[in-house]
Amino acid sequence: MGFCDRGVTVSEFKRFFDRTISRGPDDSRIIDTGKGLLGFHRLAIMGLHPEGMQPFELDGSYVVCNGEIYCFPRLKKKLMETGKYTFVSESDCEILLPMYKEYGTDMFRRLDAEFALILYDGDTQSYIAARDPIGIRPLFYGYDMHGTMLFASEAKNLVGLVWRVRPFPPGCYWKGGQFHRYADPGEAGPVIRGTEDEICAGIRERLIKGVEKRLVSDAKVGFLLSGGLDSSLVCAIAARLTGKKIRTFAIGMSGDAIDLGYAREVAEFIGSDHMEVVVPVKEAVAALSDVIATIGSYDITTVRASVGMY
């Protein structure tokens, strides 16, 4: 969460910031940049040690990021080769400030990542925010009564602080009071020529690489297995790539647990360490209000997918 001015005290900021402490139960921190406040709730995935805690700082600049930077080993190596940067953690997000020092806002188009970030530039004493091209990671913004910009991972952080909460546009960054587009998923690339077999092989290769880069984690990786095509493919690929038992989970409601059977078949086929969770219908219905409040959405598909996880 970020407040791009000193319009509130740290204690006031914390009151709104703590509405989403469940997003990061491992640690929490608020930094006063001198020109505003940055807050971060940590869910440790990469660089599990305290050195991986955000905000990261470099020469008076700070960054908070909810994201996964898939290309970070290559970028980190390139940055270290310049002789200008050293790193204190194994966190993928620690490369962001050095990347900004090297490339400015052009850094965003260089990232193979899903992310939402807020960056304070200590040299210009100004803020930048950005979101990945697809909008995988959530980010919201709004202006307070004085025209100050605020950002947060969830809309509920901003309720009571801004007059209107808006979703941050994917593929954009905000700088100098304006939004700038750095990526447009709607832009079609060149037409791929080839036979049907060649095109299918290309799809297969990309799918496998997409799963492989998401397996990099310092924390244990689990897989939600619904028994449908998508999750079954992902779990089968992961099991083959890791060469060991992966841990899969399936959630269903009592009286309508047909998906659990399909998930069980897949788990047996790939040899995973499988866990089933059956939720009584009454408990699922009773949880609806809490689920909607937690996810901050009335979207039917999102709510339906979230009840079992909750």
Outline where the language-model segments fall.
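ATP-dependent adenylate-handling active sites, centered on carboxylate activation for C-N bond formation
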Residues: C4-S11, G34-L37, E81-G83, E102, ...
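N-terminal segments that mediate ammonia production and transfer
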Residues: G2-R6, F13-F16, S22, Y62, ...
